[in-house]
Amino acid sequence: MKNLYKKKWIYLVLCIFFSVFFFNVLNHLRNSSNSKTFYYTPITPEQFGATGLGKELDTEALQKAINSGSHLVLKSGATYLIDKPLIINHSIKIETSKKNEKPAIILQKNKDSALIFKNDPVKSTYVKQTITPNQSYVVLESTEGMKIGDLLHLKSDKLWYWDNRHYLTKGELHKITKIQGNKVYLESPTSEYYKIKEGEKVTAIAYPERNLELYNISFKHPKPQNTTMLKINYTSNARMEGISVINSKMAGVLLNKTFHTYVSNSYVELGTTKDIKTGYGIQDYGGIGNVITTSTFKKVRRGVDFSGDTPSRYGTVSYSKAFGYKKDTLAVGNSGFGTHSTAEHILFENNYIENFNYAFVTRGNHISIRNNILKGFSRSFVATSYGDNVKIWDNMYESKNGSKLDYFAIIPRQYHGAFTATDNTINGLTGPFIKRNSKDLRYIHVSSNHTIP
Protein backbone atom coordinates (compact mmCIF):
# COMPACT_ATOMS: atom_id res chain seq x y z
CA MET A 1 0.00 0.00 0.00
CA LYS A 2 2.84 2.33 0.89
CA ASN A 3 4.57 1.58 -2.43
CA LEU A 4 1.38 2.38 -4.36
CA TYR A 5 1.00 5.67 -2.48
CA LYS A 6 4.64 6.51 -3.19
CA LYS A 7 4.24 5.73 -6.92
CA LYS A 8 1.21 8.03 -7.14
CA TRP A 9 3.18 10.90 -5.64
CA ILE A 10 6.09 10.33 -8.02
CA TYR A 11 3.68 10.24 -10.97
CA LEU A 12 2.01 13.45 -9.80
CA VAL A 13 5.33 15.27 -9.37
CA LEU A 14 6.49 14.16 -12.83
CA CYS A 15 3.22 15.35 -14.39
CA ILE A 16 3.56 18.75 -12.76
CA PHE A 17 7.22 19.03 -13.81
CA PHE A 18 6.57 18.19 -17.48
CA SER A 19 3.49 20.43 -17.58
CA VAL A 20 5.49 23.40 -16.32
CA PHE A 21 8.38 22.55 -18.66
CA PHE A 22 6.23 22.38 -21.81
CA PHE A 23 4.27 25.49 -20.78
CA ASN A 24 7.52 27.46 -20.46
CA VAL A 25 8.80 26.13 -23.80
CA LEU A 26 5.59 27.12 -25.59
CA ASN A 27 5.52 30.48 -23.85
CA HIS A 28 9.14 31.14 -24.85
CA LEU A 29 8.43 30.23 -28.47
CA ARG A 30 5.36 32.45 -28.53
CA ASN A 31 7.24 35.40 -27.02
CA SER A 32 10.21 34.85 -29.31
CA SER A 33 8.01 35.07 -32.36
CA ASN A 34 6.56 38.38 -31.16
CA SER A 35 9.71 39.97 -29.70
CA LYS A 36 12.07 42.31 -31.58
CA THR A 37 15.66 41.26 -32.02
CA PHE A 38 18.20 43.89 -30.93
CA TYR A 39 21.41 43.81 -32.94
CA TYR A 40 24.81 44.80 -31.59
CA THR A 41 26.44 44.19 -34.97
CA PRO A 42 26.04 46.72 -37.82
CA ILE A 43 22.66 46.80 -39.56
CA THR A 44 21.31 48.83 -42.49
CA PRO A 45 17.97 50.55 -43.21
CA GLU A 46 17.73 48.40 -46.35
CA GLN A 47 17.31 45.32 -44.13
CA PHE A 48 14.07 46.90 -42.94
CA GLY A 49 12.75 47.95 -46.34
CA ALA A 50 14.39 51.32 -47.06
CA THR A 51 15.17 52.21 -50.67
CA GLY A 52 17.41 55.25 -50.15
CA LEU A 53 16.30 56.69 -53.49
CA GLY A 54 14.71 59.87 -52.13
CA LYS A 55 11.38 59.16 -53.85
CA GLU A 56 9.55 56.85 -51.47
CA LEU A 57 9.25 57.44 -47.74
CA ASP A 58 11.86 55.58 -45.70
CA THR A 59 10.63 56.87 -42.33
CA GLU A 60 9.25 53.55 -41.08
CA ALA A 61 12.24 51.52 -42.23
CA LEU A 62 14.72 53.94 -40.63
CA GLN A 63 12.77 53.99 -37.38
CA LYS A 64 12.63 50.18 -37.27
CA ALA A 65 16.36 50.02 -37.89
CA ILE A 66 17.04 52.55 -35.12
CA ASN A 67 14.83 50.60 -32.71
CA SER A 68 16.57 47.35 -33.58
CA GLY A 69 20.24 48.06 -33.09
CA SER A 70 23.12 50.03 -31.66
CA HIS A 71 25.05 50.52 -34.93
CA LEU A 72 23.26 51.73 -38.06
CA VAL A 73 25.13 52.02 -41.35
CA LEU A 74 23.66 54.22 -44.10
CA LYS A 75 24.50 53.77 -47.77
CA SER A 76 26.99 56.25 -49.22
CA GLY A 77 25.19 58.65 -51.59
CA ALA A 78 21.71 57.44 -50.62
CA THR A 79 18.84 59.84 -49.89
CA TYR A 80 16.43 58.64 -47.21
CA LEU A 81 13.16 60.58 -47.43
CA ILE A 82 11.30 61.02 -44.12
CA ASP A 83 8.12 62.80 -43.03
CA LYS A 84 8.44 62.45 -39.24
CA PRO A 85 11.31 62.90 -36.78
CA LEU A 86 13.43 59.83 -36.17
CA ILE A 87 13.26 59.08 -32.43
CA ILE A 88 16.21 57.56 -30.57
CA ASN A 89 16.06 56.46 -26.92
CA HIS A 90 19.16 54.28 -26.54
CA SER A 91 22.88 54.52 -27.21
CA ILE A 92 23.58 54.27 -30.92
CA LYS A 93 26.14 54.93 -33.63
CA ILE A 94 24.87 56.06 -37.04
CA GLU A 95 27.25 56.55 -39.93
CA THR A 96 27.55 56.54 -43.70
CA SER A 97 29.11 53.31 -44.95
CA LYS A 98 32.25 54.94 -46.34
CA LYS A 99 33.68 57.63 -44.08
CA ASN A 100 35.49 59.67 -46.72
CA GLU A 101 32.94 59.31 -49.52
CA LYS A 102 29.62 60.97 -50.30
CA PRO A 103 27.48 61.19 -47.14
CA ALA A 104 24.03 59.71 -46.91
CA ILE A 105 21.25 62.30 -46.85
CA ILE A 106 18.31 62.22 -44.45
CA LEU A 107 15.79 64.49 -46.15
CA GLN A 108 12.94 65.74 -43.93
CA LYS A 109 10.18 66.80 -46.31
CA ASN A 110 7.95 68.34 -43.62
CA LYS A 111 8.23 71.28 -41.23
CA ASP A 112 9.64 69.18 -38.39
CA SER A 113 12.90 67.95 -36.89
CA ALA A 114 14.79 65.17 -38.64
CA LEU A 115 16.12 63.50 -35.49
CA ILE A 116 15.30 63.66 -31.78
CA PHE A 117 17.41 61.91 -29.14
CA LYS A 118 15.28 61.33 -26.04
CA ASN A 119 16.55 60.29 -22.63
CA ASP A 120 13.87 59.99 -19.97
CA PRO A 121 14.82 60.54 -16.31
CA VAL A 122 15.16 57.62 -13.92
CA LYS A 123 14.80 59.65 -10.73
CA SER A 124 13.54 63.02 -9.55
CA THR A 125 14.34 64.12 -6.01
CA TYR A 126 15.61 67.09 -3.98
CA VAL A 127 18.90 68.27 -2.53
CA LYS A 128 18.81 67.78 1.23
CA GLN A 129 21.91 69.67 2.44
CA THR A 130 23.48 73.02 1.56
CA ILE A 131 25.97 72.88 -1.34
CA THR A 132 29.06 75.08 -1.47
CA PRO A 133 31.24 75.77 -4.54
CA ASN A 134 33.95 73.18 -5.31
CA GLN A 135 32.14 70.46 -3.39
CA SER A 136 32.77 66.89 -4.61
CA TYR A 137 29.35 65.51 -3.63
CA VAL A 138 25.73 66.40 -2.97
CA VAL A 139 23.34 64.91 -0.42
CA LEU A 140 19.92 64.01 -1.81
CA GLU A 141 16.59 63.08 -0.30
CA SER A 142 16.78 59.73 -2.12
CA THR A 143 19.15 57.95 -4.52
CA GLU A 144 16.92 54.99 -5.34
CA GLY A 145 17.19 54.06 -9.02
CA MET A 146 20.37 56.07 -9.64
CA LYS A 147 23.53 54.48 -11.01
CA ILE A 148 27.18 55.39 -11.47
CA GLY A 149 27.50 57.10 -14.86
CA ASP A 150 24.07 58.74 -14.73
CA LEU A 151 23.79 62.45 -15.42
CA LEU A 152 22.53 64.57 -12.53
CA HIS A 153 20.87 67.89 -13.29
CA LEU A 154 20.54 70.32 -10.38
CA LYS A 155 18.03 73.16 -10.76
CA SER A 156 17.42 75.83 -8.13
CA ASP A 157 14.28 77.88 -7.57
CA LYS A 158 16.51 80.98 -7.28
CA LEU A 159 16.82 83.09 -10.41
CA TRP A 160 20.12 83.55 -12.27
CA TYR A 161 22.15 86.65 -11.44
CA TRP A 162 21.95 88.49 -14.77
CA ASP A 163 19.19 88.85 -17.34
CA ASN A 164 17.18 85.96 -15.87
CA ARG A 165 13.97 86.80 -17.78
CA HIS A 166 12.00 85.58 -14.75
CA TYR A 167 12.61 81.88 -15.51
CA LEU A 168 16.37 81.29 -15.92
CA THR A 169 17.75 79.87 -12.66
CA LYS A 170 20.89 78.72 -10.92
CA GLY A 171 21.77 75.10 -11.63
CA GLU A 172 24.35 72.74 -13.10
CA LEU A 173 24.90 69.42 -14.84
CA HIS A 174 27.09 66.62 -13.48
CA LYS A 175 28.02 62.97 -13.92
CA ILE A 176 27.71 60.56 -10.99
CA THR A 177 30.91 58.69 -10.03
CA LYS A 178 29.88 57.08 -6.72
CA ILE A 179 26.75 56.63 -4.61
CA GLN A 180 27.08 56.16 -0.87
CA GLY A 181 23.72 56.11 0.85
CA ASN A 182 22.10 59.45 0.02
CA LYS A 183 25.45 61.02 -0.81
CA VAL A 184 26.21 61.28 -4.55
CA TYR A 185 29.79 61.95 -5.69
CA LEU A 186 30.35 63.96 -8.86
CA GLU A 187 32.95 63.83 -11.64
CA SER A 188 33.58 67.58 -11.39
CA PRO A 189 33.19 69.95 -8.41
CA THR A 190 30.05 72.00 -7.92
CA SER A 191 29.90 75.57 -9.26
CA GLU A 192 27.29 77.27 -7.11
CA TYR A 193 26.28 77.97 -3.53
CA TYR A 194 22.83 76.55 -2.77
CA LYS A 195 21.49 77.69 0.60
CA ILE A 196 19.17 74.83 1.47
CA LYS A 197 19.07 75.77 5.17
CA GLU A 198 17.79 79.22 4.20
CA GLY A 199 14.91 77.87 2.14
CA GLU A 200 16.43 77.51 -1.32
CA LYS A 201 14.97 74.49 -3.11
CA VAL A 202 17.03 72.50 -5.59
CA THR A 203 15.61 69.63 -7.63
CA ALA A 204 17.93 66.80 -8.64
CA ILE A 205 16.99 64.75 -11.69
CA ALA A 206 19.02 61.74 -12.84
CA TYR A 207 19.24 60.56 -16.45
CA PRO A 208 20.73 57.23 -17.58
CA GLU A 209 24.07 57.17 -19.36
CA ARG A 210 23.30 57.32 -23.09
CA ASN A 211 25.64 57.98 -26.00
CA LEU A 212 25.06 59.18 -29.56
CA GLU A 213 27.57 59.04 -32.41
CA LEU A 214 26.86 60.54 -35.83
CA TYR A 215 29.42 60.37 -38.66
CA ASN A 216 29.35 61.71 -42.23
CA ILE A 217 25.59 62.31 -42.57
CA SER A 218 23.69 65.21 -44.14
CA PHE A 219 20.35 66.32 -42.66
CA LYS A 220 18.26 68.54 -44.94
CA HIS A 221 14.95 70.18 -45.75
CA PRO A 222 14.21 70.69 -49.46
CA LYS A 223 13.81 74.42 -48.68
CA PRO A 224 14.33 76.59 -45.55
CA GLN A 225 11.86 75.82 -42.74
CA ASN A 226 11.30 77.31 -39.27
CA THR A 227 12.61 74.22 -37.50
CA THR A 228 15.39 72.79 -35.36
CA MET A 229 16.90 69.90 -37.32
CA LEU A 230 18.56 67.83 -34.56
CA LYS A 231 17.38 67.84 -30.94
CA ILE A 232 19.86 66.05 -28.69
CA ASN A 233 18.88 65.64 -25.02
CA TYR A 234 20.92 64.50 -22.00
CA THR A 235 23.67 62.54 -23.75
CA SER A 236 27.06 61.59 -22.33
CA ASN A 237 30.19 61.93 -24.49
CA ALA A 238 28.26 62.27 -27.74
CA ARG A 239 30.32 62.69 -30.89
CA MET A 240 29.35 64.24 -34.23
CA GLU A 241 31.87 64.34 -37.05
CA GLY A 242 31.33 65.30 -40.68
CA ILE A 243 27.70 66.25 -40.12
CA SER A 244 25.91 68.80 -42.28
CA VAL A 245 22.61 70.52 -41.53
CA ILE A 246 20.81 72.46 -44.25
CA ASN A 247 17.71 74.70 -44.22
CA SER A 248 16.47 74.57 -40.60
CA LYS A 249 16.14 78.30 -39.96
CA MET A 250 15.67 78.25 -36.14
CA ALA A 251 18.61 76.01 -35.23
CA GLY A 252 20.78 73.33 -36.76
CA VAL A 253 21.65 71.31 -33.64
CA LEU A 254 20.19 71.78 -30.16
CA LEU A 255 22.38 70.26 -27.44
CA ASN A 256 20.04 70.23 -24.47
CA LYS A 257 22.01 69.58 -21.27
CA THR A 258 24.56 67.31 -22.86
CA PHE A 259 27.76 66.21 -21.15
CA HIS A 260 31.07 66.50 -23.05
CA THR A 261 29.69 66.53 -26.59
CA TYR A 262 32.34 66.82 -29.32
CA VAL A 263 31.42 68.26 -32.73
CA SER A 264 34.04 68.47 -35.47
CA ASN A 265 34.41 68.95 -39.23
CA SER A 266 30.73 69.80 -39.59
CA TYR A 267 28.82 72.24 -41.79
CA VAL A 268 25.64 74.18 -41.01
CA GLU A 269 23.77 76.41 -43.46
CA LEU A 270 20.38 77.46 -42.14
CA GLY A 271 19.01 80.05 -44.56
CA THR A 272 18.03 82.18 -41.55
CA THR A 273 16.03 85.35 -42.26
CA LYS A 274 15.46 88.61 -40.36
CA ASP A 275 12.22 87.38 -38.74
CA ILE A 276 14.10 84.59 -36.91
CA LYS A 277 15.30 85.60 -33.43
CA THR A 278 17.27 82.39 -32.86
CA GLY A 279 19.04 81.13 -35.98
CA TYR A 280 21.76 79.25 -34.10
CA GLY A 281 23.97 76.83 -36.02
CA ILE A 282 24.54 74.93 -32.78
CA GLN A 283 22.91 75.85 -29.47
CA ASP A 284 24.46 74.52 -26.28
CA TYR A 285 21.57 74.76 -23.82
CA GLY A 286 22.68 74.08 -20.25
CA GLY A 287 25.44 71.63 -21.14
CA ILE A 288 28.90 71.17 -19.70
CA GLY A 289 32.27 70.66 -21.38
CA ASN A 290 30.93 70.69 -24.94
CA VAL A 291 33.43 71.37 -27.73
CA ILE A 292 32.73 72.58 -31.27
CA THR A 293 35.77 72.67 -33.53
CA THR A 294 36.85 72.84 -37.20
CA SER A 295 33.28 73.51 -38.32
CA THR A 296 31.66 76.04 -40.67
CA PHE A 297 28.45 78.05 -40.27
CA LYS A 298 26.67 80.00 -43.02
CA LYS A 299 23.40 81.94 -43.25
CA VAL A 300 22.97 81.79 -39.48
CA ARG A 301 22.09 84.46 -36.94
CA ARG A 302 24.82 83.04 -34.71
CA GLY A 303 27.21 80.20 -35.46
CA VAL A 304 27.28 78.76 -31.93
CA ASP A 305 25.37 80.01 -28.89
CA PHE A 306 25.77 79.05 -25.22
CA SER A 307 22.81 79.56 -22.87
CA GLY A 308 20.18 77.52 -20.99
CA ASP A 309 17.42 77.56 -18.40
CA THR A 310 20.37 76.69 -16.13
CA PRO A 311 23.88 77.78 -17.16
CA SER A 312 25.95 76.23 -19.89
CA ARG A 313 29.52 75.83 -18.62
CA TYR A 314 33.05 75.12 -19.83
CA GLY A 315 32.16 75.12 -23.53
CA THR A 316 34.65 75.82 -26.32
CA VAL A 317 34.44 76.91 -29.95
CA SER A 318 37.75 76.70 -31.81
CA TYR A 319 39.15 76.69 -35.35
CA SER A 320 35.69 77.29 -36.78
CA LYS A 321 34.27 79.73 -39.34
CA ALA A 322 31.07 81.78 -39.40
CA PHE A 323 29.88 83.69 -42.46
CA GLY A 324 27.04 86.17 -42.06
CA TYR A 325 25.44 88.97 -44.00
CA LYS A 326 26.32 92.63 -43.85
CA LYS A 327 25.35 94.37 -40.60
CA ASP A 328 21.62 94.84 -39.92
CA THR A 329 20.57 92.16 -42.42
CA LEU A 330 19.44 89.66 -39.76
CA ALA A 331 17.62 90.06 -36.43
CA VAL A 332 19.11 92.19 -33.65
CA GLY A 333 22.13 90.69 -31.89
CA ASN A 334 23.39 88.62 -34.80
CA SER A 335 27.00 87.56 -34.29
CA GLY A 336 29.52 85.00 -35.42
CA PHE A 337 29.54 83.32 -32.02
CA GLY A 338 28.32 84.20 -28.55
CA THR A 339 26.61 83.59 -25.26
CA HIS A 340 23.45 84.90 -23.74
CA SER A 341 22.33 85.10 -20.14
CA THR A 342 23.17 81.75 -18.55
CA ALA A 343 26.71 80.90 -19.62
CA GLU A 344 29.96 80.59 -17.66
CA HIS A 345 33.57 79.72 -18.44
CA ILE A 346 33.18 79.79 -22.22
CA LEU A 347 36.18 80.01 -24.56
CA PHE A 348 36.24 81.21 -28.17
CA GLU A 349 39.65 80.83 -29.80
CA ASN A 350 41.24 80.67 -33.25
CA ASN A 351 37.99 81.28 -35.14
CA TYR A 352 37.29 83.22 -38.35
CA ILE A 353 34.22 85.45 -38.80
CA GLU A 354 32.92 87.52 -41.70
CA ASN A 355 30.24 90.21 -41.48
CA PHE A 356 27.43 89.99 -38.83
CA ASN A 357 26.59 92.97 -36.59
CA TYR A 358 29.20 91.71 -34.11
CA ALA A 359 31.89 89.05 -34.18
CA PHE A 360 30.97 88.11 -30.60
CA VAL A 361 28.10 88.84 -28.22
CA THR A 362 28.70 88.13 -24.53
CA ARG A 363 26.07 87.85 -21.83
CA GLY A 364 27.58 85.64 -19.17
CA ASN A 365 30.43 85.15 -16.71
CA HIS A 366 34.08 84.34 -17.44
CA ILE A 367 33.86 84.67 -21.22
CA SER A 368 37.25 84.46 -22.98
CA ILE A 369 37.84 85.56 -26.58
CA ARG A 370 41.36 85.08 -27.95
CA ASN A 371 43.19 84.91 -31.28
CA ASN A 372 40.13 85.26 -33.52
CA ILE A 373 39.88 87.08 -36.87
CA LEU A 374 36.96 89.23 -38.06
CA LYS A 375 36.67 90.56 -41.61
CA GLY A 376 34.03 92.61 -43.36
CA PHE A 377 31.08 94.80 -42.46
CA SER A 378 30.32 94.79 -38.72
CA ARG A 379 29.47 97.30 -36.00
CA SER A 380 32.00 96.06 -33.46
CA PHE A 381 34.20 93.12 -32.65
CA VAL A 382 32.52 92.52 -29.28
CA ALA A 383 29.24 93.60 -27.73
CA THR A 384 28.85 92.92 -24.02
CA SER A 385 25.49 92.82 -22.27
CA TYR A 386 25.11 91.73 -18.62
CA GLY A 387 27.50 89.41 -16.83
CA ASP A 388 31.06 89.68 -15.57
CA ASN A 389 34.69 88.81 -16.32
CA VAL A 390 34.90 89.33 -20.07
CA LYS A 391 38.44 89.01 -21.41
CA ILE A 392 39.43 89.76 -25.03
CA TRP A 393 43.02 89.44 -26.26
CA ASP A 394 45.19 88.76 -29.33
CA ASN A 395 42.33 89.22 -31.81
CA MET A 396 42.37 90.93 -35.22
CA TYR A 397 39.94 92.87 -37.40
CA GLU A 398 40.75 93.18 -41.11
CA SER A 399 39.04 95.49 -43.57
CA LYS A 400 37.40 93.92 -46.62
CA ASN A 401 36.20 95.93 -49.63
CA GLY A 402 36.70 99.15 -47.70
CA SER A 403 34.84 98.02 -44.58
CA LYS A 404 35.56 99.48 -41.13
CA LEU A 405 34.36 98.87 -37.59
CA ASP A 406 32.35 101.53 -35.78
CA TYR A 407 33.94 100.43 -32.48
CA PHE A 408 36.08 97.58 -31.25
CA ALA A 409 33.85 96.97 -28.22
CA ILE A 410 30.47 98.15 -26.95
CA ILE A 411 29.85 98.19 -23.19
CA PRO A 412 26.20 99.07 -22.46
CA ARG A 413 24.83 100.56 -19.26
CA GLN A 414 23.58 97.18 -17.95
CA TYR A 415 27.09 95.73 -17.84
CA HIS A 416 28.72 96.26 -14.42
CA GLY A 417 31.41 93.57 -14.37
CA ALA A 418 35.11 93.34 -15.20
CA PHE A 419 36.29 93.99 -18.75
CA THR A 420 39.76 93.39 -20.20
CA ALA A 421 40.97 94.04 -23.77
CA THR A 422 44.67 93.69 -24.59
CA ASP A 423 46.92 93.09 -27.61
CA ASN A 424 44.15 93.34 -30.21
CA THR A 425 44.77 94.70 -33.73
CA ILE A 426 42.13 96.69 -35.64
CA ASN A 427 42.78 97.54 -39.28
CA GLY A 428 39.92 99.93 -39.97
CA LEU A 429 38.06 101.89 -37.26
CA THR A 430 35.80 104.93 -37.63
CA GLY A 431 34.82 105.62 -34.01
CA PRO A 432 36.41 105.29 -30.56
CA PHE A 433 38.00 102.00 -29.55
CA ILE A 434 35.30 101.40 -26.93
CA LYS A 435 31.77 102.74 -26.84
CA ARG A 436 31.08 102.78 -23.12
CA ASN A 437 27.65 103.60 -21.72
CA SER A 438 28.17 101.82 -18.41
CA LYS A 439 29.26 104.15 -15.60
CA ASP A 440 29.59 101.44 -13.00
CA LEU A 441 32.17 98.90 -14.15
CA ARG A 442 33.75 96.78 -11.45
CA TYR A 443 37.05 96.79 -13.34
CA ILE A 444 38.34 97.78 -16.78
CA HIS A 445 41.77 97.23 -18.30
CA VAL A 446 42.52 98.22 -21.91
CA SER A 447 46.13 98.19 -23.12
CA SER A 448 48.57 97.31 -25.92
CA ASN A 449 45.90 97.43 -28.62
CA HIS A 450 46.87 98.54 -32.13
CA THR A 451 44.48 100.61 -34.23
CA ILE A 452 44.67 101.74 -37.85
CA PRO A 453 41.91 104.24 -38.81
Please identify what each model-predicted range represents.
Residues I217, I243, S266, S295, ...:
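Consensus "Asn ladder" position of solenoid repeat domains
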Residues K2-C15:
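N-terminal Sec-pathway targeting helices
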Residues E101-I179, Y185-S188, Y193:
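Autoprocessing Asn-cyclization modules and mimics
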Residues D83-P85, A104-K111, P222-M229, K249-N256, ...:
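Short glycine/acidic-rich loop motifs that flank beta-strands on beta-rich extracellular proteins
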Residues R30-A61:
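Right-handed parallel beta-helix/beta-solenoid
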Residues G69, N89-S91, K93-E95, N110-K111, K118-K158, G171, Y207-P222, I232-N247, ...:
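Parallel beta-helix/beta-solenoid
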Residues G49, T59, S70-D112, S156-E172, ...:
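N-terminal extracellular ligand-recognition/capping segment immediately after the signal peptide
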